[in-house]
């Protein structure tokens, strides 16, 4: 085995402990990760600001600057932050607002700050929130959406629209790797639906999940759902199928691609309610060695070996909605958030321990073509994927604060980080 030079060993140790280089000096926060530190791209820096959580998933700020965290298996926490500028933040208080071990992922807060929404596998709850006292009265809990229980994919992502603040979107995944019930729109499986919560009177029963406006179906597990602030476009990121074969040949290593899907604009039926193909059709990522490739290109849909009789590659590309972009197989995208001018979407890749950016144009669409394999640009990565998933950060939820810093959760490590663009080359302080 070749021996590394002393300076190489020192550099490797430095990256392990501190990331690609040192971030701004911060005397109020000396937290460090206990695994190989993530590496920030040029022009970015990050800092670990909270540890000791159980499994932090969705995160969102309240109007007074408190960071609300859906800590799966615990409930909803509120972190009070001391802000010394840049990435120099630290947590001065960690309070449990809602204690409910059934809460597992979804979290949203109303535009007026007075209502917190959180989800279990079966229900979406609304709680009255007092932002002045930073408290929730548990007796105010009300079920607003119900009847969502299924096995396998049990998270229920929540998004409150900024364009139409009374519209609550809920994403529900499949009950199996390839779920035959998802072929039936009345099953509610593998769908995103929207609900006008302003129409729910105090004495009304909750919405049944399948009663919501259909935003999209044939979506295996679209955990990440986001809204482009410039035009209100709704986007989701799809976790596609595992263990895929094509004409009996194992192609699962690089196919199918994970997906970025467009669902139109709330209040406008164009591009809304379409079927995206699951479980009959999947999107092509790698063409190398793909059986019966024919004229298929990256991003095209192809028929599953288990597809309904009569479904072919041709019908997959004419009868179903194609993804706008595809990503490497099995990166497991879990959230998508846009910057304020809608020029960039940020996406967490839970499976590959990355945070990436995707460029958007003034038309509200990605600037990359549908067949691109380079649309996702790494912002934060793990230095050694051979150590994953046991010894890596695993990003889940994203949220921006009022000055544009990007915060994210890492569920397997129980951590919260802050990430921002900097004037220096790539840096970080794990």
UniProtKB/Swiss-Prot annotation:
Family that this chain belongs to: Belongs to the sugar dehydrogenase AA12 family.
UniProt cross-references to PROSITE patterns, sorted A to Z: PROKAR_LIPOPROTEIN
Obligatory cofactor(s): Ca(2+); pyrroloquinoline quinone
Presence of the UniProt keyword Calcium in the record: yes
Signal peptide positions (record): 1-23
Species of origin: Hypocrea jecorina (strain QM6a) (Trichoderma reesei)
Disulfide bonds: 281-316, 388-392
Its biological purpose: Pyrroloquinoline quinone (PPQ)-dependent oxidoreductase that catalyzes the oxidation of various sugars such as L-fucose.
Subcellular location(s) of the protein: Secreted
InterPro entries in the record: 6-blade_b-propeller_TolB-like, PDH_beta-prop, Quinoprot_gluc/sorb_DH_b-prop
Highest taxon listed in the record's lineage: Eukaryota
Protein name: Pyrroloquinoline quinone-dependent sugar dehydrogenase
Main location class: secreted
């Amino acid at each position: 085995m070749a021996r590394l030079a002393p300076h190489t060993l020192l550099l490797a140790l430095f990256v392990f402990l501190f990331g690609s280089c040192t971030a701004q000096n911060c005397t109020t926060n000396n937290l460090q990760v206990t695994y190989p530190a993530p590496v920030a791209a040029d022009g970015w820096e990050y800092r670990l600001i909270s540890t000791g959580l159980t499994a932090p998933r969705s995160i969102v700020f309240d109007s007074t600057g408190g960071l609300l965290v859906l800590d799966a298996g615990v409930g909803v926490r509120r972190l009070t932050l001391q802000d010394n500028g840049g990435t120099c933040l630290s947590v001065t208080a960690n309070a449990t607002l809602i204690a409910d071990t059934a809460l597992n992922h979804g979290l949203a807060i109303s535009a007026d700050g007075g209502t917190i929404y959180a989800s279990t596998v079966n229900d979406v709850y609304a709680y009255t929130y007092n932002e002045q006292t930073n408290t929730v009265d548990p007796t105010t809990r009300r079920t607003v959406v119900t009847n969502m229980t299924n096995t396998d994919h049990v998270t229920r992502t929540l998004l409150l629209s900024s364009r139409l603040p009374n519209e609550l979107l809920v994403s529900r995944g499949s009950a199996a790797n390839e779920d035959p019930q998802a072929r039936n729109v009345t099953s509610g499986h593998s769908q995103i639906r929207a609900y006008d919560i302003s129409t729910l009177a105090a004495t009304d029963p909750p919405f049944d999940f399948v009663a919501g406006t259909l935003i999209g179906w044939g979506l295996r597990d679209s955990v990440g759902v986001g809204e482009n602030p410039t035009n209100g476009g709704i986007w989701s990121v799809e976790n596609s199928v595992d263990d895929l074969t094509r004409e009996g040949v194992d192609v699962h290593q690089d196919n199918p691609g994970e997906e970025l899907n467009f669902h139109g604009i709330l209040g406008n039926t164009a591009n809304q309610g379409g079927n995206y193909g699951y479980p009959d059709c999947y999107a092509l990522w790698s063409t190398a060695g793909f059986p019966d490739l024919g004229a298929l290109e990256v991003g095209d849909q192809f028929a599953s070996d288990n597809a309904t009789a009569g479904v072919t590659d041709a019908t997959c590309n004419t009868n179903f909605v194609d993804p706008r972009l595809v990503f490497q197989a099995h990166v497991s995208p879990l959230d998508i958030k846009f910057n304020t001018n809608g020029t960039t979407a940020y996406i967490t890749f839970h499976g590959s321990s990355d945070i990436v950016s995707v460029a958007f144009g003034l038309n509200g669409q990605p600037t990359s073509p549908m067949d691109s394999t380079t649309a996702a640009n790494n912002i934060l990565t793990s230095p050694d994927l051979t150590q994953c998933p046991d010894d890596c950060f695993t990003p889940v939820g994203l949220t921006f604060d009022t000055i544009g810093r990007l915060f994210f959760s890492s569920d397997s490590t129980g951590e919260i980080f802050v990430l921002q663009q900097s004037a220096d080359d790539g840096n970080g302080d794990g």
